[in-house]
Amino acid sequence: MVGTTSSLDEIRKAQRADGPAGILAIGTANPANHVLQAEYPDYYFRITNSEHMTDLKEKFKRMCDKSTIRKRHMHLTEEFLKENPNMCAYMAPSLDARQDIVVVEVPKLGKEAAVKAIKEWGQPKSKITHVVFCTTSGVDMPGADYQLTKLLGLRPSVKRLMMYQQGCFAGGTVLRLAKDLAENNRGARVLVVCSEITAVTFRGPSDTHLDSLVGQALFSDGAAALIVGSDPDVSAGEKPIFEMVSAAQTILPDSDGAIDGHLREVGITFHLLKDVPGLISKNIEKSLDEAFKPLGISDWNSLFWIAHPGGPAILDDVEKKLGLKAEKMRATRHVLSEYGNMSSACVLFILDEMRRKSLDDGVATTGEGLEWGVLFGFGPGLTVETVVLHSVPV
């Protein structure tokens, strides 16, 4: 007989961690180049040779004013755009130029964030067992996960997973995957990286496609990295910042075509329907009920909140629907204001902002003094990721 049921059970148990997955370190990075939102309409219409479209420019100014964004970081500089006029047209073939940027710059920006996370973690990088890399910016083989592994000098046997073109919900997806990897592989330390560069979506204005213009007013560049692991080695200085208790993904009903993107010769084209905020706010309580019923929690103001800041209208509608106090979305709105919509990286930036503000304010936990929290990712599908978080004492 090759083996017994008891020995298989013992092997299975030995392979799995004892405790929940925790976020052990966070690092973020942005390109040095940044634009002030108040000045962006003038810059955008000038660089795209669209200043004759005066009515559309006024409309774009109003979009930027309503965005609640103060500044955004962007890899694309004025000099580069002048050298690549096809990227400034509304629908000119330009995929090669865009790909040449993101194939190099997405892993590089991801490395910047990863180096910071590894430094905070304080352990040798040889302890990293898994890499999960996510970007909506471009596609390549071997992927950005491979490039990052080389840039950081990780072990060639590190187990890699590459996620391309998932969109804004994917910050929640990488946490869900990292949780499963950490809890089902004893001793696993998962490096999670989300790196986004808008070079694939930047284009000039069109008065017949205003949804494209909305993206030009919101999207920005940034990368965030986490180290995720279960059973922290306290003797080595490991300590969780947040613990992940559960994670779920769902497709919202009647939401086909609400958000979608397509890779074309002109780059990635995005389409957003006006009822996206309504669709999310209408369905969010069901996701909350399912996530928090096992914990007996139904007071949404008792939670700390990390929500993907798709735009102020989504946050406003969610607040109104759930009766949330204004301070619940403080960390989310701060990241939207200072960085814009960085797609998948946003929720990881918000985690970082929340733990830093909690430390600065001297509250009891990393979750603004509260014990339980929720992280939401929203994106194409319309897909929603829901992660239940547990804070730790500061």
Swiss-Prot record:
Catalytic activity: (E)-4-coumaroyl-CoA + 3 malonyl-CoA + 3 H(+) = 2',4,4',6'-tetrahydroxychalcone + 3 CO2 + 4 CoA
A Pfam family the protein falls into: Chal_sti_synt_C
A GO MF label: naringenin-chalcone synthase activity
Disulfide topology: none
The protein's enzyme class: transferase
Pathway: Secondary metabolite biosynthesis; flavonoid biosynthesis
Record keywords, A-Z: Acyltransferase, Flavonoid biosynthesis, Transferase
The EC number(s) this enzyme carries: 2.3.1.74
Active-site residues from the entry: 168
Listed GO biological process terms: flavonoid biosynthetic process; polyketide biosynthetic process
Family to which the UniProt record says this protein belongs: Belongs to the thiolase-like superfamily. Chalcone/stilbene synthases family.
Function: The primary product of this enzyme is 4,2',4',6'-tetrahydroxychalcone (also termed naringenin-chalcone or chalcone) which can under specific conditions spontaneously isomerize into naringenin.
Name this polypeptide is given: Chalcone synthase
Gene expressing this chain: CHS
